[in-house]
Structures are given as C-alpha cells and as structure tokens.
C-alpha cells in the first residue's frame, strides 16, 4: 500500500487523528480525537484532478429525490459540544444535516456512510483546512436595531433570542416585546432578516390573561425584568403560565432588593426551570450576591459578554453603560447609587472563573444594552484562553490539548442556549436531522471572523471580495449578504420560533408569515444537569463587605489580564 508522510497528508486533506490545531493567536490547542471517514486512501475532495468526479467520488445515477446530497463539506475538522473534536465529511440535504462520516460514491469507495452519497446534485465546500461549528445562539438580545443581524452573522451567530421593538427606552433596557400588536409588528418585520429569531414577551404581570395573550400572539417565551418589577408575585405568575404552555422564562432580578433578596427570588422559583440573566450581577440583579443562583439545580445561569473576559478596563466602562441603558440620570444621587451597586470588581472577576468551572452555563451579548452582539463567539474563546493562562489546564483536559475547555465554551454559545429556549432539537449542534446552520472558520481566525455562514444549508453570509474582480478574493474583502439572504430563499432558510399556543392558533397564516415557523418544546423539564459540559453546582458565598466570592470555600479570583488574545491583531479599531 502506498504511504505518504503525515505532513503530506495534512497538506492534502488537512489534519487527522493526533494532529493539533492552534486557535488564532491564543494558547488554546485542540487535538482531533476521532476520524469518522472510515479508512485512509479514499478521501473525497473537490477540485481539478481530485476525486469528486463522475464515476469516481460522484455516483452516476442517484437523484436528489432518491437521497443524493445537496452539499458536502469535505475533510473538515468539527468542533462541536456534542460530537467533540472530530474529522469528518458532513452531508446536507433539504436544509438539514444528514450526518457526519465518510461521503462519496459507494460503488467506487470503501466505507461510505449511509446517506452521505454524492452525485450530480451535490455541491462542495472544501473543508480540509477549516473548522466547522454549529451556528451560535445569542440568548440575550435587545432588538434595538435590525442592523444587529449583520454584526451577529459576522461573528457566526445564526439565532437571536430576546425582545424589543427598536430604539425606545423600554427596549434599551429590557429584552421583551410587549403585547400582541408589538409582537405582530416584530414578527412581520423579521421576515426580511436572514437569521433565526425567538421573541420574548413581557412576563411582568401578576394577572394571567395578559401573559397568555403574549403567547398566543407569537411570543416564544417570557422575560421578567426588574425595570418592570421582578417581584416574587410576578415571577410566580409567569412561571405558572410557562409551566402550562411549555415556554422558557428568563429573569433579570431585583438589584435594589426592594421586593426581597436573592433567597426570596430563589424561593419564588419553587424549583421550577428558569434562566437567570446576568448571573454575575454586573448587568443587574440582586446585589451583591446574585451569584448564589449558580448553585441551584433548577436554574440555568448565563452572563453577558461585556465583562468576559474580565480585563483591566472591564470595570471602568460599566458605569456609563448602566446609566444609558436603564434611563438613569447622573445628576440624581439615587440613580448613581443604583449603577454603582452593580459594579463590583470581585464578582466580575469571579464570573470568568465560574464560567471556566462550568458553573455558569451560557454566554449572551446583551446587545447595545451593555454588550456587543458581534463578539459573543469571540468573547467565549477569549475567556477560555484567558482562563487557561490564569488557571492552567482543566482537570478534564487530556495532556497536551485543550479540547474539553474549548468544547465547554462552545457549548455556552450553541447547544445550551438552544436547550434552554426549547429549540435544542432543531439547532445548537452538528447532529443528524438538525437544521443546517453551520459556520466555517479558518483556524487563524477561529472565534473572530468566520469564512462562511450557512443558514439552512445555503450560504447566507461570507467574507467576500470585490464582486467585479476576476476572483472571489481581491480587496476590498468584507462581510456581505449571500444568496440565502435574498428573495424567498431567505424565508426557507431562517426560522421564527413561537410558542406552541401561537403555532396551533395559526400565527403564520394570521400574520401572513412566509418564514419557517416552529414551536418551542421541552422547556419545563430542563435543569442545570442538562447543560452540556456546564452543569457544575457549587456552593457560593459572597462577602457583603468586600464582595469576595468563595466557591466551595475557595476564593474565586484571578488577576485581570493586561492583554487578551484574538484582539488588536485582528481589528483596526
């Protein structure tokens, strides 16, 4: 049998088992654990003189209707919270992931995975020197401006979850779309945006009828926010409706402790599944000890990207952010005191440590309301790297690689938000049958700038050169919408998630929606144990004077880094 060197193989087909990949300019290295392509020597590859040719790697007679793939991503390195770090061909058909394995022509190739047959209907992406992840999900979005979609796609985010109606004061502070009319208008508006949406209704009501009204009008879940009164009574009422209608509830708790302390809010949850925003408290919530929520098995904790990783300037920028977002006046002492109560360096530093331990399960952006929607993937990988440098290897990592740590942070922006919202059966990981929302990255730009963003199996967003050039690559290179972002293809490759109540009442027909409309499900049975690679339940103590955080009796702190990877090397500003 003919043999080639490992270096030659990597040049031709990319890395394989045992090879390591550095992620950007970070100190994070992933190592390929498995190669799902069966055997060496029968690799499928597109290009001149390559194997994806008729009668070779391309089956002669199979039609698309009979199962031929629409798209194959060949020889790609998959980094996925469920799959791990693996080498595979990935097949896509009818907008869904068919599977991972060995693609090609079973008449001429050994070990072709069932369903991954290529033929005349198949196009190709050469993944030999690329990394594939699931599209990211931003679980904390203020719908302030539709242009947020462009920034989100430019960092590999393919699903937005939040609420709002534009740059009004309520939306600047709260991620809810309030009432049936506003919900209808937003559902109509997002028809033209090439990204998945879930809209949260206002959960601040002790009356049941207004909450049900939100769900029947198309809300996919609820948000209870302190600006509208996050009282125990409102929380209990909202959770009761959520239990009946199977939708998620997110809560931004009471910073001022006016209606109770963190223990009172936890008691109001009554053991029911709830997603706590700003679990570190800097973005709002019970001061100073909201972090205690990360030790509860029914609470699904997230935090937002402005304080991740905690750098030397993180604390300094928070005060002005809070004043603007929550309609506060720097001339009013009580408003200033409110803002200052959130800015606690000790709890902000502990946030990064708790993420690294898997105690905080998700990362969102808090878009234009303290956070940056185009940096959610980026901040996740930056935090992973900063924590490796500060805390060393994780106990779960194998010698010589950072696979577990990287996968832990990938889970925070992919599968865990999807599970929390009740859409984990549709998106969030690279698994057979799921919607083909996928992101391709060059290793040098991993987490920073994707190469291609696929929505429903079609390219929606890409780093594209001059359209008048002789090649796709001449300058100016910048992100541009692709064909999945135009025409009726947009509606076939993007999903609007709604409650089952709205779905059953025909919300799509009532509002004339052309996008794919899907109901959420399974939200009330999700607990911390379901958070992939992020299910740790520590005992948290917060000193009321110094704000020092102890995790299982150990002070949780690191020195803020003076410089951060994946940062100024990659950006002009």
Swiss-Prot record:
Keyword Acyltransferase in annotation: no
UniProt record similarity statement: Belongs to the metallo-dependent hydrolases superfamily. Urease alpha subunit family.
Predominant subcellular localization, coarse grouping: cytoplasm
Cofactor note: Binds 2 nickel ions per subunit.
Alphabetical UniProt keywords: Cytoplasm, Hydrolase, Metal-binding, Nickel
Subunit structure comment from the entry: Heterotrimer of UreA (gamma), UreB (beta) and UreC (alpha) subunits. Three heterotrimers associate to form the active enzyme.
One family name in Pfam for this protein: Urease_alpha
Molecular-function GO term, any one: nickel cation binding
Reaction equations catalysed: urea + 2 H2O + H(+) = hydrogencarbonate + 2 NH4(+)
Binding site for Ni(2+) 2: 223, 252, 278
GO process terms (BP): urea catabolic process
Protein name: Urease subunit alpha 2
Matching InterPro entries: Amidohydro-rel (IPR006680), Metal-dep_hydrolase_composite (IPR011059), Metal_Hydrolase (IPR032466), Rhodanese-like_dom (IPR001763), Urease_alpha_N_dom (IPR011612), Urease_alpha_subunit (IPR050112), Urease_AS (IPR017950), Urease_asu (IPR005848)
Co-factor(s): Ni cation
GO cellular component, one term: cytoplasm
Keyword set includes Kinase: no
PANTHER family: UREASE (PTHR43440:SF1)
Coiled coil: none
Record-annotated Urease domain positions: 135-573
EC category name: hydrolase
Active site: 326 (proton donor)
Pathway note: Nitrogen metabolism; urea degradation; CO(2) and NH(3) from urea (urease route): step 1/1
Sites where the protein binds Ni(2+) 1: 140, 142, 223, 366
Species of the source: Brucella suis biovar 1 (strain 1330)
Localisation: Cytoplasm
Residues engaged in binding substrate: 225
């Amino acid at each position: 049998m003919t043999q080639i060197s490992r270096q030659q193989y990597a040049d031709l087909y990319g890395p394989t088992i045992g090879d390591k990949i550095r992620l950007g300019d970070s100190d994070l290295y992933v190592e390929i654990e498995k190669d799902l392509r069966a055997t060496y020597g029968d690799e499928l590859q597109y290009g001149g003189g390559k194997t994806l040719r008729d009668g070779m790697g391309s089956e002669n007679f199979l039609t698309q209707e009979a199962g031929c793939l629409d798209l194959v991503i060949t020889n790609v390195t998959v980094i996925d919270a469920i799959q791990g770090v693996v080498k595979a061909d990935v097949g896509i058909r009818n907008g869904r992931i068919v599977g991972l394995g060995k693609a090609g022509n079973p008449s001429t190739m050994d070990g072709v995975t069932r369903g991954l047959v290529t033929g005349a209907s198949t196009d190709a992406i050469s993944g030999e020197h690329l990394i594939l992840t699931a599209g990211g999900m931003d679980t904390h979005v203020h719908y302030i401006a539709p242009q947020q979609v462009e920034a989100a796609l430019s960092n590999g985010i393919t699903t937005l979850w939040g609420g709002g109606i534009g740059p009004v004061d309520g939306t600047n502070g709260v991620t809810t779309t309030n009432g049936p009319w506003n919900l209808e208008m937003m559902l109509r508006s997002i028809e033209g945006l090439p990204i998945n949406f879930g809209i949260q209704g206002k959960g601040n009501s002790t009356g049941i009828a207004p909450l049900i009204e939100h769900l029947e009008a198309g809300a996919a879940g609820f948000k209870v926010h302190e600006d509208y009164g996050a009282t125990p009574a409102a929380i209990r009422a909202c959770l009761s409706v959520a239990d009946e209608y199977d939708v998620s509830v997110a809560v931004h708790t009471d910073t001022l402790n006016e209606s109770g302390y963190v223990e009172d809010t936890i008691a109001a949850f009554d053991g029911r599944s709830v997603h706590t925003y700003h679990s570190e408290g800097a973005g709002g919530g019970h001061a100073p000890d909201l972090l205690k929520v990360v030790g509860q098995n029914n609470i699904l904790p997230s935090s937002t990207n402005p304080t991740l990783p905690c750098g030397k300037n993180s604390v300094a920028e928070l005060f002005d952010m809070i004043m603007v977002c929550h309609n506060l006046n720097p001339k009013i002492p009580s408003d200033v005191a409110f803002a200052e109560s959130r800015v606690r360096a000790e709890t902000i530093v502990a946030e990064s440590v708790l993420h690294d331990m898997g105690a905080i399960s998700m990362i969102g952006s808090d878009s234009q309301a303290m956070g940056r929607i185009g940096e959610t993937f980026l901040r996740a990988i930056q935090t992973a790297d900063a924590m490796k440098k500060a805390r060393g290897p994780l106990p779960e990592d194998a010698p010589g690689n950072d696979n577990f740590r990287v996968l832990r942070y990938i889970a925070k922006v992919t599968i865990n938000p999807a599970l929390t919202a009740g859409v984990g059966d549709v998106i969030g990981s690279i698994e057979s049958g799921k919607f083909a929302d996928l992101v391709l990255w060059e290793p040098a730009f991993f987490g920073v700038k994707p190469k291609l963003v696929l929505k429903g199996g079609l390219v929606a967003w890409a780093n594209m050169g001059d359209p008048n050039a002789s090649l796709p690559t001449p300058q100016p290179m910048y992100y541009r919408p692709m064909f999945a972002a135009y025409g009726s293809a947009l509606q076939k490759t993007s999903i609007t998630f709604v409650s089952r109540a709205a779905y059953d009442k025909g919300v799509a027909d009532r509002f004339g929606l052309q996008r794919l409309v899907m109901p959420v499900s399974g939200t009330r049975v999700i607990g911390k144990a379901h958070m992939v690679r992020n299910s740790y339940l520590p005992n948290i103590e917060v000193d009321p004077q110094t704000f020092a955080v102890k995790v299982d009796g150990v002070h949780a702190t690191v020195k803020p880094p003076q410089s951060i990877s994946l940062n100024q090397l990659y950006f002009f500003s």
